[in-house]
Amino acid sequence: MNPELFAETLSKYNFKLSPVQEQQFKTYFKELVRVNEHVNLTRITDEDEVYLKHFYDSVTPLLLWPEVFAEGAKLCDVGAGAGFPSLPIKILRPDLEVTIVDSLGKRLNFLSDLLEKLGIEGVNLVHGRAEDVGQNPDYREKFDLVTARAVARMSVLSEYCLPLAKVGGKFLALKGPRADEELEDAKSALEKLGGEVVFTRVITLPGSTEVRTLVLVDKVEATPGKYPRQAGTPNRKPL
């Protein structure tokens, strides 16, 4: 998917890229590849692949479920790495208030420099483990929408993300092709954490065989105070 096809595909979903937005994606690609030479951000560096597997993949929830992204909503992206999915979404929807949580300072340094080059405001970068941030009253149950892409299996991911979503908010997981198995394993975790799966959708990225599953979870009850557990525990002992 080259930049022109990317823009053309978005326009079919009523997202007409402005010249500024087109340039922001071009700069994002160039900076990603440049910094990736000395900081491990991604194994994908070919332009067509970055536009498909990073940029387009990140915005698919916004294209398919625009109603989930309310005007001015507060979005938290857990383990965003090089900014996926939240920054491509933010480029398309500058009104969103975005908080990015990541445990690696080098990645956050990249994002800080990138945001300056892109001229993007309204993004808060938080250095820390999701388990610790989820217990911090400044962030706990403060977000309308919490996103995560390819961070951990669903049972673990739920404990990272659901404590950050406010009651009535949503948790959106961007998963691979085998999400059904993960969801089965995560039933107990979701119940304990106050989440309820409302929708899953399997898609294939355009012009490829890349299968993705989007999982939308409603935060129906407050998360008990003991969750998330101590850093490292969710991964070692999933709920």
Swiss-Prot record:
An annotated GO cellular component: cytosol
Domain of life where this protein originates: Bacteria
EC code(s) of this entry: 2.1.1.-
Enzyme class: transferase
Keyword Methyltransferase: yes
Keywords: Cytoplasm, Methyltransferase, rRNA processing, S-adenosyl-L-methionine, Transferase
Gene Ontology molecular function terms on file: rRNA (guanine-N7-)-methyltransferase activity
InterPro entries in alphabetical order: rRNA_ssu_MeTfrase_G, SAM-dependent_MTases_sf
Residues given in the record as S-adenosyl-L-methionine binding sites: G79, F84, A130, E131, R149
Major place of residence: cytoplasm
Pfam families per the UniProt record, alphabetical: GidB
Annotated localization: Cytoplasm
Keyword Cytoplasm: yes
Record-stated family: Belongs to the methyltransferase superfamily. RNA methyltransferase RsmG family.
Function: Specifically methylates the N7 position of a guanine in 16S rRNA.
Protein name: Ribosomal RNA small subunit methyltransferase G
Organism the protein comes from: Lactobacillus delbrueckii subsp. bulgaricus (strain ATCC 11842 / DSM 20081 / BCRC 10696 / JCM 1002 / NBRC 13953 / NCIMB 11778 / NCTC 12712 / WDCM 00102 / Lb 14)
Gene: rsmG
